[in-house]
Amino acid sequence: MAKSVFNQEKVDFTKEHMFFGADQNTQRYDVFRHPVFDKLNQTMLGYFWRPEEVSLQKDRADFQNFRPEQKHIFTSNLKYQTLLDSVQGRGPCLAFLPHVSLPELEGCIVTWDFFETIHSRSYTHIMKNVYADPAEVFDTILDDKKIIARAVSVTKNYDAFTEAADNWTHHKKGSMREVKKKLYLAMQNVNILEGLRFYVSFACTFAFGELKLMEGSAKIISLIARDESQHLALSTHVLKLWSQGKDDPEMVSIAKECEEEVYDMWRECVAEEKDWAEYLFKDGSMIGLNETLLHKYVEYIANRRLKALGMKQIFDAPVNTNPLPWTQHWLSSSGLQVAPQETEVESYVIGGIKQDVDEDALKGFSL
């Protein structure tokens, strides 16, 4: 049966599962089954920004003075980032949103997808300011074998889930458990994408920024990284609610059943990111960064993500020792201390309200 955009039956959505429950009716944000998603949504909305707010005037001159190997690193990463956010600019709404049962998660996913579109516009903003003809970069993305090879692993679980969900929803082909299994793997794939696949390219852009090169681009990527940390938190919360039995009970056994497959997905991603690092530095490394350091960094990030999911760390890098400690202040908004008139202030939150203030907090104030 086709889904309705407005279910006229009364439903207590605080008792529904996150996915494949009753069709939704009123979008209400006063009572929640999982309040964490509304809090995440509020945080993301408070971080609203536009790439045009960041000046790229100096970046154009910096890029023109780059050596060929530096241009290769910067351009290849931009192309790869464009691919990833092209997937995420439509993936969450296309794949997950039709099957969401909770208003708070629905709102969170819509905001998530909207910010991914800002990221895609950001890459266009950088290209239009740095290259004489941005089309020369855009038109070669689908011709780049290294990028297309990555597109397969990035999208295959999304596509498998959307196909299975469509077959079940509209044709009653397959089984609900199989659809849920593919949903679980698709969400794990998103967690890997948001939590690891960007970080080699992030590190390279931040390394240029550390050298006072392409600083505008580095600040834009820092804003994107801040957003991606929220998107990572979203998928991490979904996965942990499933594995801990706090949502759909059937997802507990599905999580256990898929555990080794998930570890293989992480291994595949780490191998691909290491291969990408080698491709970036095939003509030479850059000051402060080389493929060996990036290999360690990829394993370090992967282990941290696995730990956050409550899974075992399967790589050699210790989770408490960052091989690239200087990247941290680019990934932390509060670490960038700048004058407001000079650049985009990343730690500024729009519409931030503290709602848990009691009467005691106002003691000592008088009018």
Residue ranges of model-derived segments:
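Non-heme di-metal
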Residues: 2-367
